[in-house]
């Protein structure tokens, strides 16, 4: 029997308009009533994710910044991982041949140099989380959890080649969304963060289930006892984890539908969405 459920937020738990549907909210509360540990694992900043949970009346553990931060259910930070100072310095000061915009995440917030398009801000309407305009090269080299590049996917694929050539195996690169490429501390991902959290709680990864849709969910989905892939997941994720169940679309609150079946039949081995 699984004792912890971990959920990606955007594209998984949230609908395309970045809201939590009523069925999803109800099933999350059912899990809490069953004394399951509920964990939200997201690329979002803590200052973005926590207000969403508070508004919904949810209390759970938080993995934020794609594994760079871990918080307990009272909001106490359990683990923090930053880019090494020399690497952060190189990311911020190297001239990358790209039109993608650069965004830096620190405990104090989201930093960028230019105004962010309104469509990017829609994802943060529930929390009110907003960027801070600053000259990125003036940021301290210490305390930078991750750097995100936003732009068209084809542009980011070219940038990914540059970053791999420059850093080799000194960082992890990950597509957290089709139009978002992230530079993360080496070995830092949702899977490693969930492993740390599960050990903190006295659990094994085999006792955890997880849901996700993007490449930043790959390690988490691959290492838990039961990983579930969204129907709207990136094709790369589905091809890399062909052994995992695929359920419906986040627009139809597929996580809620799946869990409603699972709560009635915990040993369910097929997807009720298909």
Curated annotation (Swiss-Prot):
The protein's matches in Pfam families, at most eight in alphabetical order, are given as: Hydrolase_3 (PF08282)
Q: Which reaction does it catalyse?
A: 4-amino-2-methyl-5-(diphosphooxymethyl)pyrimidine + H2O = 4-amino-2-methyl-5-(phosphooxymethyl)pyrimidine + phosphate + H(+)
- What InterPro entries does the annotation carry? Cof, HAD-like_sf, HAD-SF_hydro_IIB, HAD_sf, HMP-PP_phosphatase
Concerning SUPFAM superfamilies, the annotation shows: HAD-like
Write down the EC number. 3.6.1.-
- Where along the chain is the active site annotated? 8 (nucleophile)
An example molecular function term from Gene Ontology annotations = 4-amino-5-hydroxymethyl-2-methylpyrimidine diphosphatase activity
| Amino acids binding Mg(2+) | 8, 10, 213
Cofactor(s) needed by this chain: Mg(2+)
Keywords from UniProt, A to Z, are: Hydrolase, Magnesium, Metal-binding
Which HAMAP family does the entry link to? HMP_PP_phosphat
Q: NCBIfam families, per this entry? A: Cof-subfamily (TIGR00099), HAD-SF-IIB (TIGR01484), PRK15126.1 (NF011705)
What is the purpose of this protein?
Answer: Catalyzes the hydrolysis of 4-amino-2-methyl-5-hydroxymethylpyrimidine pyrophosphate (HMP-PP) to 4-amino-2-methyl-5-hydroxymethylpyrimidine phosphate (HMP-P).
What family does the Swiss-Prot or TrEMBL record give for this protein?
Belongs to the HAD-like hydrolase superfamily. Cof family.
Name of this chain's protein: HMP-PP phosphatase
The protein's organism comes out as Serratia proteamaculans (strain 568)
Q: What does UniProt list as this organism's lineage?
A: Bacteria, Pseudomonadati, Pseudomonadota, Gammaproteobacteria, Enterobacterales
């Amino acid at each position: 029997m699984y004792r912890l459920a971990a959920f990606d937020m955007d594209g998984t738990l949230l609908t395309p308009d970045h809201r939590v549907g009523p069925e999803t909210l109800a099933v999350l509360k059912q899990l809490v009533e069953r004394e399951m540990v509920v964990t939200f694992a997201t690329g979002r900043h803590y200052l973005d994710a926590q207000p969403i949970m508070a508004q919904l009346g949810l209390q759970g553990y938080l993995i934020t910044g794609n594994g760079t931060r871990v918080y307990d259910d009272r909001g106490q930070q359990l683990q923090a991982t930053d880019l090494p100072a020399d690497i952060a310095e190189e990311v911020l000061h190297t001239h990358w041949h790209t039109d993608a915009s650069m965004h830096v995440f620190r405990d104090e917030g989201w930093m960028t140099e230019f105004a962010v398009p309104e469509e990017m801000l829609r994802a943060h309407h529930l929390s009110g989380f907003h960027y801070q305009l600053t000259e990125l090269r003036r940021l301290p080299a210490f305390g930078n959890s991750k750097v995100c590049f936003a732009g068209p996917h084809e542009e980011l694929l070219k940038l990914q080649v540059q970053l791999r050539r420059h850093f080799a195996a000194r960082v992890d690169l990950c597509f957290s969304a089709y139009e978002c490429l992230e530079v993360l501390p080496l070995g830092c991902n949702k899977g490693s963060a969930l492993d740390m959290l599960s050990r903190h709680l006295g659990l094994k990864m085999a006792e955890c289930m997880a849901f996700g849709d993007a490449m930043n969910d790959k390690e988490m989905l691959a290492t838990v006892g039961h990983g579930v892939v969204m129907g709207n997941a990136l094709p790369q994720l589905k091809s890399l984890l062909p052994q995992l169940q695929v359920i419906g679309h986040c627009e139809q609150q597929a996580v809620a539908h799946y869990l409603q079946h699972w709560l009635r039949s915990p040993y369910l081995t097929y997807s009720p969405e298909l």
